[in-house]
A protein has these predicted regions:
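Active-site beta-strand/loop signature of hydrolases that rely on acidic residues for catalysis
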Residues: 1-17, 77-81, 100-133, 167, ...
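N-terminal, active-site-proximal structural segment of metallo-dependent hydrolase catalytic domains
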Residues: 1-20, 200-240
Length: 240
């Protein structure tokens, strides 16, 4: 496989040392190593700038926001997330996860630039929260109509869930989406190939947003101290 961009999650110092050879192949990167299972590393063959690591709802949970410069001059917003799951050992409720996802989604909805969002969202594609995120952001799920692509848990074939996601704006068409073989992690890697084709891409239908969706999303976002306006907007362009 020869991807243009690699996104690694749950990275720590050990992982950073093991991933260091990638610096020779991927000259641009954004790294945030943490020992709490929420580290994040992004490697790119293309220039990354206007990049920022943020802690939107939790001082220990990073997210990454950046511009990817394509060789032909195209600029793409890339957002990488790994929100906290609802669980007895992490967070009893899904408040933080939902709020972070929806805040980023609302900031994306105003973007004039093409957008890709990737990460372990600790939620399945058909959940109410994921569907609400898609309505608020306007992004598309390339899996729709193509299968589940369950990525967790790689060690238990009888119990797997699609927790790792790639969403994209209507500027793109999907060329291929694959779950790659087990590489030793408890998550399978995912490979997505997107083609910039805005004329054809705009024919793809996103989920329709209603006023009640906006009200519910705002209610969830109000449960934290941050707001959609706090999300870094790489490229600085918004629809008028």
């Amino acid at each position: 496989e020869k991807p243009d961009i690699l996104v690694f999650l749950e990275t720590n110092l050990w992982w950073e040392q093991k991933l260091s050879p990638l610096d020779e192949v991927f000259p641009y990167s954004l790294k945030c190593l943490k020992e709490n299972l929420y580290g994040m590393h992004v490697y790119s063959r293309m220039i990354l700038n206007d990049a920022e690591i943020q802690y939107l709802v939790d001082k220990e949970i990073p997210s990454m926001h950046m511009i990817v410069h394509m060789p032909e001059g195209l600029r793409i917003r890339l957002h990488c997330l790994h929100p906290v799951p609802p669980s007895p050992t992490e967070s009893d409720e899904s408040t933080d996860r939902d709020s972070e996802l929806l805040m980023v989604g609302k900031s994306i909805a105003d973007s004039e630039l093409p957008v890709i969002l990737a990460g372990d969202l600790n939620d399945v594609a058909w959940s109410a929260t994921t569907r609400l995120f898609m309505k608020i952001s306007g992004l598309l799920d390339p899996r729709r109509g193509r299968g589940f692509f369950s990525t967790f848990h790689s060690h238990y074939f009888f119990l797997r869930w699609p927790l790792d996601h790639v969403f994209h704006s209507q500027h793109f068409m999907l060329k291929s989406l694959r779950r790659l073989p087990d590489m030793g992690s408890d998550h399978f890697p995912v490979m997505a190939e997107l083609v910039y084709a805005p004329v054809h891409g705009m024919q793809q239908e996103s989920l329709e947003k209603e006023k009640s969706d906006e009200v519910l999303a705002q209610k969830k976002m109000d449960m934290t101290d941050s707001a959609a306006e706090d999300v870094h907007t790489p490229g600085g362009q918004k629809k008028s």
